Amino acid sequence: MNIALELAKKGEGFTSPNPMVGAVIVKNGHITGKGYHKAAGKAHAEVNAIDEAGDDAKDSTLYVTLEPCNHTGRTPPCTEKIISAGIKEVFVAMEDPNPDVAGGGIEFLRSKGIKVSTGACLKDAERLNEAFIKYVKTKRPFVTVKCASTLDGQIATATGDSKWITCGKSREFVHRLRHASDGIMVGINTVVKDNPSLTTRIEGLNGSDPVRIILDTDLLISEKARVLQINSNSDIMIISGLSVSQEKKALIEKTGAKVIESKVYDKKFIDLDYLMDLLGAEGITSLLIEGGGSVISSAFSAGIVDKICFFYAPKIMRGNNGVSICRGSGVLLMKDCINVHNIKIKRFDDDVMIEGYIK
């Protein structure tokens, strides 16, 4: 099953809105077939593994990271392929999290005399598809907040300078986070100060660009901003308030961007909880927030954050006039802090990344 999980990871960034799935076929103690789901609309992992195994699939054992589908979508049911191949036993890491189909594939295989066991490497399988699991249950994206700061919690100097806080290896990993995400979100201040492209750049990999999402209540973005001019196959969404200039909206949409008018509160802040429903309806299953201190603070306040990836560089900025990770007023009592769970720590040269979960 561990081999199947590693295979599944090869589909990262390409399978959405489908999950990442890997499959391995074993006969007489030898692997005869391996496969993974390469992209949405392409053959599922089980089919690829069975095709590779050929005649050796008969009387074999299948290891698969997600319950085989039992319905016709963009591809035929995998259960039918498993049955026709003559596979005698199936090990499934996790059931399909979709409440409308959960358990159906397993029960169908059992009804045909195939032995099915579940739960092997369950936690690893759930972690692999954490975004897919949340989306099929809530129709809202799985939200990860990423930031890079000094040891004293500053993400930029008083002048706005932030290039570069972290090392090259840390920044490369961030691009892998972008590749794995359906959408990336920043605020208009980041666009104005940094003029980013918000694309994915990974050496040796044709990475997927996430949908670029910019919070811009008053539609202040320039039509000449790099994010609107750079060549990319991904969409751009500008999230504005409800009373923006229609002339400016038309000007921005001429660049190919889509302006989405959203609810605001206090006359200037996008309602992020409401926005998650809008993004879910647009098919965004996973969202990476790379915004500045105001956007990050708003995301935590709105309760939309599922996961954090905080990078710390061995630098101390000194003073309190820089830009902190979170802006605005914080809690008054330590007991009211947001707790982070299931912590993992990774090293990138001298940088440290803390990964953890909010919910």
Enumerate the language-model features and the residues they cover:
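Zn2+-dependent cytidine deaminase-like catalytic core
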Residues: 25-124, 211, 237, 244, ...
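Enzymes that bind and transform nitrogen-containing heteroaromatic metabolites
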Residues: 1, 7-11, 16-18, 34, ...
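Generic structural signal for helix capping and beta-alpha/helix-loop junctions
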Residues: 99-100, 126, 269, 296
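A broad detector of the eukaryotic-type serine/threonine protein kinase catalytic domain
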Residues: 9, 87, 92-95, 114, ...
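Proteins enriched for Cys/Gly/acidic motifs involved in redox and nucleic-acid/cofactor modification
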Residues: 13-15, 106, 120-148
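Short beta-strand scaffold segments in enzyme catalytic cores
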Residues: 20-29, 147-148, 354
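Short N-terminal amphipathic alpha-helix/helix-capping patch enriched in small hydrophobics
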Residues: 17-21, 45-46
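Structured loop/turn residues at beta-strand edges in well-structured enzyme cores
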Residues: 55-58, 85, 138, 179, ...
